[in-house]
Amino acid sequence: MARYRGAVERLERRFGVSLALKGERRLSGKSALDKRAYGPGQHGQRRAKTSDYGLQLKEKQKAKMMYGISEKQFRSIFVEANRLDGNTGENLIRLIERRLDNVVYRMGFATTRSSARQLVTHGHVLVDGKRLDIPSYFVRSGQKIEIKEKTKSNPQVVRATELTAQTGIVPWIDVEKDKKYGIFTRYPEREEVVVPIEERLIVELYSK
């Protein structure tokens, strides 16, 4: 699956928001966005007027980059969100938040979603006691997510736990940080998910 390989802080400056792509630098307030909150390049401080389509496309790209999801997966999640009852945009965000890699990140066992995805794909994460290496797996209410015993002392996991202790844990997850496990207690409400995404624009884009 194709991933963005460029300078992620430059990307954040282009979007004008933190995408949580540089964990430790972001948590310490040393990211490029904290220092220069405008676009990269010679004319970065000028904001050109963008068309409606451009705004919609930018919002989708922002969401994909933030969560580390390919176009194929993102569209598939949108189709499922549209099938469900309720607001399609809210369903979209709630479904993405249920991805296993995102839940591991939300539990504070990794400083970025990319690092969380690596923990999952390399077999370091257990779901209800069984190893699961599929980052796109949708976690269900009541499921226990745990770092494998041999990985609990991994310096990166320990460091992530220390750093994310400053930011707190989202209300739909209960975490035992010392024991490196958590319970996904319920599905999140949209207003609880603090992300700089206007999902309405994404729905408009896919609805054309």
From Swiss-Prot:
S4 RNA-binding domain sequence ranges: 98-156
UniProt xrefs under Pfam families: Ribosomal_S4 (PF00163), S4 (PF01479)
Cited SMART domains: Ribosomal_S4, S4
A GO molecular-function descriptor: rRNA binding
Species the sequence originates in: Helicobacter pylori (strain HPAG1)
Gene3D superfamilies in the record: Ribosomal Protein S4 Delta 41, Chain A, domain 1, RNA-binding S4 domain
Gene Ontology cellular component list: small ribosomal subunit
Protein name per the record: Small ribosomal subunit protein uS4
Keywords associated with the record: Ribonucleoprotein, Ribosomal protein, RNA-binding, rRNA-binding
The protein's role, per its UniProt record: One of the primary rRNA binding proteins, it binds directly to 16S rRNA where it nucleates assembly of the body of the 30S subunit.
Keyword Ribosomal protein in record: yes
Gene: rpsD
